[in-house]
Curated annotation (Swiss-Prot):
Family statement drawn from the similarity comment of this UniProt entry: Belongs to the V-ATPase V0D/AC39 subunit family.
Record-given protein name: A-type ATP synthase subunit C
Organism: Methanocaldococcus jannaschii (strain ATCC 43067 / DSM 2661 / JAL-1 / JCM 10045 / NBRC 100440) (Methanococcus jannaschii)
Assigned keywords, A-Z: ATP synthesis, Cell membrane, Hydrogen ion transport, Ion transport, Membrane, Transport
Recorded GO CC terms: plasma membrane; proton-transporting V-type ATPase, V0 domain
Temperature dependence: Optimum temperature is 80 degrees Celsius.
Main function: Component of the A-type ATP synthase that produces ATP from ADP in the presence of a proton gradient across the membrane.
Residue stretches in coiled coil: none
Domain-related comment: Purified ATP synthase is 25.9 nm long. The hydrophilic A1 domain is 9.4 X 11.5 nm, the central stalk is 8.0 X 3.9 nm and the membrane-bound A0 domain is 6.4 X 10.6 nm; the domains are connected by two stalks. ATP is synthesized or hydrolyzed by the A1 domain while ion translocation occurs via the A0 domain.
Location within or outside the cell: Cell membrane
């Protein structure tokens, strides 16, 4: 039916014309509903594309990094290497090559090697941060605080054992939020107390100052380290307490990390005979799966067996129960720490597939690389200490 412009402008005639085609009102209703549904789908797809587009480039870069992760064959090759020099040769064509080669003359020093690998991680974090969209940067920036924390711990340990300024600075990683000039200045001081005072004006000063009286009484620096770990986890938790789908993924990941680190503190505390009151100073409440009341129950539990019993019904019960046999043989908390680190790895991998075109791959790469570096440190340390291949394998977190 041909319609001229005047007819189109006449709403009544337009209605009549439409009804000529759709003499059944139900047919018209179906057509209108279909149009609305199509529009909703178009809007949803458009929004999804807009949300995911910023991750296209970063995820392409991350996939290329993931492709270079060590498989079991590569790890076995490193473990079976005949010497440190041979091991470094095997690493030469990997992402770690340039970092390890720089400390070839210090290969017998596990601290120098550890610093080289930490430098790799720091550079990786820097790369991911630079290429990530703003929705991910706020959490990645807090993750990068771990290098500040590591430097502060190193400064405190160095001054506790009386290292010189030169020896101290050689151990630091010149990355993070603390300026390099400030790190040099802190390396020059003589005592632990001076390190704390030198951090006045930074976000870390208050928590360290609160631990000074405990240090004065016990001459034990573990309180500083636990307080810093707690502060780091609380910073992560505060950052991800926002709305949004990307933050939901980060929230689950960070919450799991908080659960795991809390369990490490509690298990170590039980092994060392700490009271619930002492433990509560260093446990970060509100993780992902472990509620505040559950953490308080675990801190009050009787020994390690009591902690494991108190975890019944959680995702961590089976993980730690499987590690109990190794703990009973070795009497080392490392058996539990290794099992919990593996749990975090598996969680990261699951989350990376849940949001494969968004923030998921970022989480997957971070957790995979951190545990790969832990394994590398264990292999190199094992070679330095002349451990047998099977002994080195027992230290690794399976990937």
């Amino acid at each position: 039916m041909a319609m001229d412009i005047e007819t189109l402008l006449d709403l009544e005639k337009l209605y009549s014309a439409i009804m000529t085609y759709f003499d059944n009102p139900l047919t018209l209703l179906i057509v209108v509903a279909t149009i609305i549904i199509v529009l909703i789908v178009i809007v949803w797809i458009t929004k999804m594309v807009i949300d995911l587009a910023p991750y296209a480039y970063v995820n392409a870069r991350i996939r290329s990094k993931e492709a270079k992760l060590f498989d079991d064959a590569k790890l076995n090759e490193l473990i079976e290497s005949g010497s440190l020099e041979e091991l470094v040769g095997l690493l030469e064509d990997t992402d770690y090559g340039q970092y390890v080669i720089e400390v070839m003359n210090e290969l017998k020093d596990p601290v120098a090697v550890e610093k080289a690998l930490d430098m790799y991680l720091a550079d990786l974090y820097g790369l991911i941060y630079r290429i990530s969209p703003d929705s991910a940067k706020k959490v990645l920036k807090v993750f990068a605080k771990k290098f500040d924390i590591k430097n502060i711990k190193t400064l405190i340990r160095a001054k506790f054992v009386g290292l010189s300024a030169e020896e101290t600075y050689a151990l630091l990683i010149p990355l993070g939020n603390i300026p390099v000039e400030k790190l040099k200045e802190l390396a020059e001081v003589k005592t632990v107390e001076e390190v704390v005072r030198g951090l006045d004006g930074t976000e870390y000063f208050k928590i360290l100052q609160e631990e000074l009286s405990n240090y004065d009484q016990t001459s034990n620096i573990i309180g500083f380290e636990l307080a810093l770990d707690k502060y780091y986890l609380e910073s992560l938790r505060k950052t991800i307490m926002t709305e949004g789908k990307e933050e939901d993924i980060f929230r689950e990941f960070v919450g799991t990390i908080i659960d795991v680190e809390n369990l490490k503190v509690i298990l170590k505390g039980k092994a060392d005979g700490l009271s619930a009151e002492e433990l509560s100073k260093y446990v970060t409440l509100t993780g992902y799966e472990l509620a505040d009341w559950k953490l308080k129950d675990l801190m009050s539990a009787g020994g390690i067996e009591g902690v494991l019993s108190g975890l019944e019904g959680t995702s961590y019960a089976e993980v730690l129960a499987e590690a109990m046999e190794e703990y009973e043989k070795t009497k080392s908390i490392y058996a539990f720490e290794k099992a919990l680190d593996k749990f975090v790895l598996e969680k990261g991998k699951k989350l990376s597939t849940r949001k494969p075109f968004g923030v998921g791959p970022i989480i997957g790469l971070i957790v995979s690389k951190e545990l790969e570096v832990k394994n590398l440190k264990a292999i190199i340390k094992g070679k330095i200490e002349n451990l047998k291949p099977e002994e080195i394998r027992s230290l690794l977190i399976s990937l």
